[in-house]
């Protein structure tokens, strides 16, 4: 079956740049030109000029398309500046040629990100109505549909966020969190499809390395956000209660107000965050990230062509039954609840389960189960952050004796966080029991 891999040029100014790149790599290829356009009932449309490069060697098994034009989506023009590689995924020589072309294209001066090759589906993606069962390769009778439909769109989104973060110098703080969440979700889905994708562990580790680049900055952002909330809401008990309830409806703040603005701590963290940002952004180049994600997509497309007798629904049901039973069977005892290392492992399992479940619309889990799962994950996250921050802030105070107010400010922050963590801990057993009951009922429905 034919597979497609699309590279969108983020800094390409005209079609000649795209055509020139491909002509240099495929000098003997036959070139033909065609105009593609399509209009949709909601006034969206696309129109572009396509140059097709067909290698002259018989049975090459691949071709390259250079597309230049525009999409009109919600009255907004979006550039089309694509190099699309079409190839037979069961042809080893064609796959090898595509792999080499990827390496050569991404080694140049032009910058690329992955994008949806089908322009009609790209419009859907931009409008937020990207339905997997509309994709060309979607087949309910084949479990390997998960590889070619449930993962690629996540790669497109991650690659574009990397573009925004790296090209923007990391200034937009929300991008750091969004990217970390999407990388975690990708790792969760790779775990889910592991029986279909033997190289899943290798690619999960590579994705983890990308996420690790973001971790230091994100940790500083969490602390800075807490400092700001403490400064804004610390003077009033009712405000503190309101703030805590915003973080989680199940966590009730029990402490009174805290005075002080924590300026020394905040300024120190901001400086350290800026240093971490410069280090993180300097570690990666956009084309290097794109090459890693494109290589993962290529590996997924190859694996999707392998024989599989199981249907998509049967595969997902079996996997989630297995994961769900393991969660329900976790030993949950009162004396384990202050073992933060153990709770962190449980939290990782819950996050993996939730992110994977959210990525599989075919399973249609109940809103009550998803909400209970999120509350439980939030509680464990609050406990873990409190545990990690306690150790980090103690080291920070010890390293800065020259700041006399720092110890006082850290003590205020720790007291505020500790009270929230204690409140979460009181609710934890009841929330776990509720989640386990809902999960057990859902597992029975999957039988």
Stretch-by-stretch model annotation:
Residues 1-447:
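Function-determining surface determinants
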